[in-house]
Amino acid sequence: MTATEQLTKKLIRVGHSPDPDDAFMFYALAKDKIDLGSYEFEHILQDIQTLNERATRGELDISAISIHAYAHVSETYALLPSGASMGDGYGPTLVAKKKFSREEIARKKIAVPGKMTSAFLALHLWLAD
């Protein structure tokens, strides 16, 4: 690649978590396994809540975000037709030292990965039933 070609590359900032599923999705870009043409990608690895917050400020060109956060950024970002980190047996999990009823859980203090995460939304919807 010539110096002129290097100067004309368009930089795209991509935010994703360091989790294995995101690492898999972005591996080919990060390791130069595909021809990027006139694009250059900067990988920004952060936790999902931080990525959600950055998306609300429009700081990244492309970003992994929670589906819950998408409701807050749908005017700025478009959903891609693939990619997801939830499914049967995978996704938000509530962990406790002993078993509690839903009513007991509703009265407990619960740690969540962020208020704009799918885990928080799922918990909120489950407790509201």
Regions found by a protein language model. Give the residues of each.
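Bilobed "Venus flytrap"/periplasmic-binding protein-like clamshell domains
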Residues: 7, 11-31, 92-129
